């Protein structure tokens, strides 16, 4: 058994604090593996390999937060209309192989897209999920692993303006990277709520999880005590 929480729109720093709290609880065996699904307000996050002077081109008047993180990878953009998934998994139960874990996240994304009729794939030498001919990125991955417990995860473009990816940052360090969304590929409106059940099912399939939904309202601060204590109780 594992837990899944649907947090709705949640600030990046609040979600990061929650991940760290949960990771500590998972590491100690207080709670099982736990998966968070959410959306973020507009934010640019910087991975450990970000070169700010080369990658960031954010206008001074842009209403966007910028956060340095401990995840792998370079800079990326999060915003409403993007499904973000943060699996807090103990890799001692999932193979103790970080590269294989990232490949499984890609498999889960490809499965999610396939359920919606979108043909996602990998591109050699690049992390994330893409659509071929011409190559365009539809999902980003960046993870952190400490004591074999994972934080951060993936961001799947459902229906959002891709301009920040190309105008504000040199995403993934690729000058000419193209970006797309599920809505653009299907040529119809698509909501995060429509995509989320397929994402849950794909994670269950790829990681062999049985996800139990824990009731959660929109955001952090729902629990009077630390979340890991609440779930362990």
Language model region names:
Residues 110, 146, 201:
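Short glycine-/small-residue-rich flexible loop motifs, especially phosphate/cofactor-binding loops
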Residues 85-87, 127, 141-143, 154-158, ...:
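A structural signal for short, well-ordered beta-strand segments
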Residues 130, 159-233:
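C-terminal accessory segment of soluble enzyme catalytic cores
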Residues 49-57, 65, 138-158, 162, ...:
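Short, conserved beta-strand/beta-arch hydrophobic-aromatic motifs that form part
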Residues 1-138, 189-190, 220-233:
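N-terminal lobe of the biotin/lipoate ligase/transferase fold
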């Amino acid at each position: 058994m594992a837990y899944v929480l649907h947090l709705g729109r949640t600030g990046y720093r609040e979600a990061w604090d929650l991940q760290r709290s949960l990771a500590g609880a998972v590491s100690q065996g207080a709670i099982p593996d736990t998966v968070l699904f959410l959306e973020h307000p507009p934010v640019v996050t910087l991975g450990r390999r970000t070169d700010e002077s080369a990658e960031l081109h954010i206008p001074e008047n842009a209403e966007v937060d910028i956060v340095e993180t401990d995840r792998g990878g370079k800079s990326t953009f999060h915003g409403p209309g993007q499904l973000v998934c943060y699996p807090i998994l103990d890799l001692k139960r999932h193979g103790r192989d970080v590269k294989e874990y990232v490949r499984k996240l890609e498999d889960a994304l490809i499965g999610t897209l396939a359920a919606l009729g979108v043909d996602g794939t990998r591109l050699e030498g690049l992390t994330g999920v893409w659509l071929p001919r011409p190559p365009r990125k539809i999902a980003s991955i960046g993870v952190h692993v400490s004591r074999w417990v994972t934080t951060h995860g993936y961001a799947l473009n459902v229906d959002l303006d891709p301009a920040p990816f190309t105008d504000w940052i040199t995403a993934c360090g690729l000058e000419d990277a193209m970006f797309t969304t599920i809505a653009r590929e299907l040529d119809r409106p698509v909501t995060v709520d429509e995509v989320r059940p397929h994402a849950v099912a794909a994670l269950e399939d790829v990681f062999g999880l049985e996800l139990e939904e824990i009731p959660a309202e929109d955001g952090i601060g729902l629990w009077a005590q630390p979340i890991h204590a609440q779930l362990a109780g």
